[in-house]
Amino acid sequence: MSLFDDGLEDLDRHPTHAHHPAQVIHDGPFVLEDGEPLQRTGMLVLSDEHLEHARAAIAPLAAHLAHAFLVFSEAGLLVHASVRGEQVYVTLAPDQFSTFVWSGPQAVFLGNVDGSGGVLDALKVDRRRTVFNVTFEVYGAFPARLLTRRAYFADAGVLATGPGSPSVACVYKHEFNDYCIMLPSRAPDVSLTLSRPQVAKLAAVAKGAAAGTTFALARGLDFSVSSSAGVVTFPARDRDGTAVLERASQRRQGVDAVGATEPFAMTLETAHGLLTLLQRLRAGNAELTFNFFTTPRQAPLFSVTTCGPVRATTFFFCAPADPATVPAAPEGAAATVAAACGAGASAAPAAGDKRPAAPRMYTPIAKRPRAASGEGGHAYGDLF
């Protein structure tokens, strides 16, 4: 029998629980009042490379995830948190788990355990012990399901020296059924991928801003970020597919862009949250993708997404601005970086596309379960 089969008798007899008055301390099968056992409706396991990918995405944000929402569904796991007032989403699709089994409507749980810990603490980097398996199990039926999170670990160095007796830390949480989370429901109009040095230059402009920070794409396809502290410009040259393929083998020095080429400008009133998140997301990520939603024009916004196997995404609401008023960087300025843009507009509407003038930006996840038919559902990977 495998260590992680259903028969975890030895580990279940003596689990290490999170001792807190609000927690369920349980040492046996979950049962209803009439004595019938609760049915397991979900099992999600992270181990090996799947665990490493999840840890790489979550660890930089771990300090802010104690009070996150955890949304389990047939689309995977969505972690929704707030950092400096900005909304952050980490998504894991079903194929990003070592084991994924789910039935029934989505289930939401609060990630907090006590004042200093949370359900996702098992994904933090811990030098004292090595976590090698994290298992989420959901029991019961809506709206009174129960989440069990088991983290299997050994003292640091034990796994490297040979087999030993692993320990398990268990946390139990009851379903949270009074919630509403808004998720983006359409593709961005323009996506720009910036390298870590380029993100550092962008952050320097935003950090010194006395007022707002403006992001703009000029008609000549020059992407710029400006504030009272200065301006950084990433000029783009339109290239055909052959040129892009030829350049792919070289060291990239510029911005890769995909999307419509209509000029736009939007102003982020305060960059405090952006700077904090850029600092967190740059850790372990060689590139970040900036996705700009330019319609409806009176309410633009952009998101920042990591480029790893497991992605973290954060959104920023902006005010509309006039591209003609955006200052240009001095000619030959050190901040100016030559860039290569992919030709075409793969994210632009196709010929004959009759999309509405003000498309619906968000899909709500409400407290009532989604219909069994799955209508109105989205895979998290399609949203971010």
UniProtKB/Swiss-Prot annotation:
UniProt entry tagged with the keyword DNA-binding: yes
SUPFAM superfamilies named among the record's database cross-references: DNA clamp
Primary location group: host cell
GO biological process, one term: DNA replication
UniProt superkingdom: Viruses
Subunit organization: Interacts with the DNA polymerase catalytic subunit. Interacts with the origin-binding protein.
Family from the record: Belongs to the herpesviridae DNA polymerase processivity factor family.
Designated name of the protein: DNA polymerase processivity factor
Organism of this sequence: Suid herpesvirus 1 (strain Kaplan) (SuHV-1)
Lineage: Viruses, Duplodnaviria, Heunggongvirae, Peploviricota, Herviviricetes
